[in-house]
């Protein structure tokens, strides 16, 4: 079993532990806000349709605003940009809370939640710091990227659970309130660690990341992979509901995230062979193959516990795939525009999640929850086809006729 000493060496870097602690605190609410908003709005207004529409509007607004926020971070620095942007987002959350609490018109909910779109990409800023601190050390950067992906999975695994606990145990607005406080506190702790912040350039030369060679195909892969995540979540909720065990859906999805988290930490402790461009198709192929397990478990057994095991195993392909993708984004993004490049990748994922959720929901409603598990498999196959479009990867060469 690989030793985890690379992580110890990572956090021996001066300032690494401090900025990581603040960033994790700021990142945890990312898994809380959506669930908190749905529980708060649906509980007060009695409409899940309204709650879903409000959160979908916020997701769309984030897709539009996030790249601009990231561009400002690259241009003016993390501390000067992220903190004001976070204050605006926190005020948006507070406004949403007050509008729901005082029975304000529905349009105020949409406007308030849209304001939270200024939330900076905290994970991207942390990765940018690692890229700055570990410049020239590809092995250490691989470990750092793996840790960041595991942290993402952990936050998105614990966030919904914490949100549901707060809203259900205390009062419906508790999840939104605590999330806003954590976001603001974590961002303050993170941005005040100036010693590890990447330097700011008055003028950033080169093309925008969207025009950089190799970035658009990666964004297309991210879009397809987002479809995997969005469809899997919706279909699993529907499958558990059809079994009469809707309350267990969160645990089942948490197991998938746990599998990815463990795989990410193990992946970061080893030194994978070959360039990232050659590894990506293999990672996506593994994801596509393992996603067949939930489909088979649902179709052949109809057992929720077996489905949970299948999702746990399938989740183990997620982190290596995402780590490799983000490594390629870092390699291909023009110098000085790393936050923008990684935020574009996240935006692609969010767009895919929205599409996957819609297609997965339609499939479960018009066919069956079991048939819905074909959607993430199809999305993964599309991601594989897109990743194979690069003629430079070894996967393509292996399949080519001699």
Spans of features found by a protein language model:
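C-terminal ends and interior cores of transmembrane alpha-helices
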Residues: 87-103, 286-301
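C-terminal transmembrane helical hairpin of 12-TM major facilitator-type secondary transporters
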Residues: 278-323
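Helix-loop boundary and gating motifs at the non-cytosolic
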Residues: 2-63, 209-254
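Intracellular juxtamembrane helix-capping segments at the cytosolic ends
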Residues: 37, 120-135, 236, 320-333
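Cytoplasmic helix-loop-helix junction between adjacent transmembrane helices
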Residues: 113-152
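Hydrophobic core of transmembrane alpha-helices in multi-pass small-molecule transporters
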Residues: 24, 105-122, 223, 306-320
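Helix-to-loop junctions at the C-terminal end of transmembrane segments
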Residues: 64-78, 167, 262-277, 364
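A late C-terminal transmembrane helix in Major Facilitator Superfamily
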Residues: 332, 336-367
């Amino acid at each position: 079993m690989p030793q985890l000493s690379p992580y110890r060496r990572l956090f021996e870097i001066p300032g690494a532990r401090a900025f990581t602690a603040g960033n994790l605190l700021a990142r945890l609410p990312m898994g809380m806000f959506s669930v908190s908003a749905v529980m708060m709005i649906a509980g007060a207004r009695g409409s899940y349709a309204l709650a879903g529409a409000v959160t979908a509007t916020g997701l769309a607004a984030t897709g539009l605003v996030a790249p601009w926020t990231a561009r400002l971070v690259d241009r003016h620095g993390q501390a000067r940009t992220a903190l004001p942007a976070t204050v605006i987002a926190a005020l948006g959350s507070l406004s949403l809370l007050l509008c729901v609490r005082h029975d304000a018109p529905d349009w105020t909910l949409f406007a308030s939640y849209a304001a939270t779109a200024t939330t900076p990409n905290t994970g991207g800023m942390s990765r940018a710091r690692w890229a700055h601190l570990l410049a020239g050390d590809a092995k250490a950067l691989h470990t750092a990227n793996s840790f960041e992906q595991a942290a993402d999975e952990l936050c998105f695994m614990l966030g919904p659970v914490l949100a549901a606990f707060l809203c259900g145990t205390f009062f419906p607005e508790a999840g939104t309130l605590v999330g806003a406080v954590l976001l603001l506190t974590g961002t303050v702790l993170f941005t005040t660690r100036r010693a590890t912040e990447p330097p700011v350039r008055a003028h950033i030369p080169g093309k925008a990341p969207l025009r950089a060679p190799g970035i658009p195909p990666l964004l297309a892969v991210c879009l397809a992979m987002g479809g995997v995540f969005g469809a899997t979540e919706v279909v699993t909720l529907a499958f558990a509901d059809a079994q009469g065990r809707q309350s267990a859906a969160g645990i089942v999805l948490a197991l998938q995230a746990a599998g990815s988290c463990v795989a990410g930490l193990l992946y970061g402790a080893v030194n994978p062979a070959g360039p990232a461009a050659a590894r990506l198709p293999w990672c996506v192929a593994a994801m596509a193959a393992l996603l067949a397990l939930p489909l088979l478990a649902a179709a052949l057994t109809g057992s929720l516990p077996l489905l949970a095991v299948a999702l746990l195993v399938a989740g183990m392909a997620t982190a290596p795939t995402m780590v490799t993708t983000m490594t390629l984004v870092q390699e291909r993004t023009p110098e000085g525009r790393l936050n923008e490049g990684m935020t574009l990748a996240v935006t692609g994922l969010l767009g895919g999640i929205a599409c996957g959720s819609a297609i997965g929901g339609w499939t479960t409603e018009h066919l069956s929850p079991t048939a819905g598990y074909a959607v993430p498999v199809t999305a993964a196959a599309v991601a594989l086809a897109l990743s194979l479009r690069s003629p430079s990867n070894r996967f393509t060469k292996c399949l080519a006729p001699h």
